[in-house]
Amino acid sequence: WWPALRKNYADPAHLSPEARTPDQRRMYMIHHPARTPSAVVSTCPGHLHMNLLPRLQRRGIGSKLFAVWHAAAAAKGASALHVGVNRENRNAIPFWQSLGFTELTLAGVPEGRTVWMGRKA
């Protein structure tokens, strides 16, 4: 899906980060996505990404979506799972903890805006 997005959105790499609008910052991320640290993938290879609109949060929808995804991942043989959570998203960290995820301790990976969390499948 990255290639399709890249066709629709120009790469604003020619602009300095300070000069980019919020939309251009997102467009830059489409063309230059941050990579998941290898220490995360080697420990917890399965990956899930979930965004819910605020009006849909705290209604059990996220937990139900995770249950369906988790069952499919387990059926395909996933051994452990990871999510990357924005450190500023104070509601997301407790949500993932409620589903059994814990913060991963990663030697050699500097603390950034992403909190890496994992759990056994």
Regions found by a protein language model. Give the residues of each.
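Short, contiguous strand/loop micro-motifs
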Residues: 39, 56, 79-80
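C-terminal "cap" of GNAT-fold acetyltransferases
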Residues: 44, 86-93, 97-99, 105-121
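Conserved short-loop catalytic and cofactor-binding motifs
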Residues: 36, 53, 84
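Conserved GNAT acetyl-CoA-binding A-motif
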Residues: 44-46, 50, 73-86
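Conserved acetyl-CoA-binding loop-helix of GNAT-fold acetyltransferases
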Residues: 49-52, 58-75, 94-98
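Conserved acyl-donor/pantetheine-binding loop and adjacent beta-alpha core of acyl/acetyltransferases
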Residues: 1-49
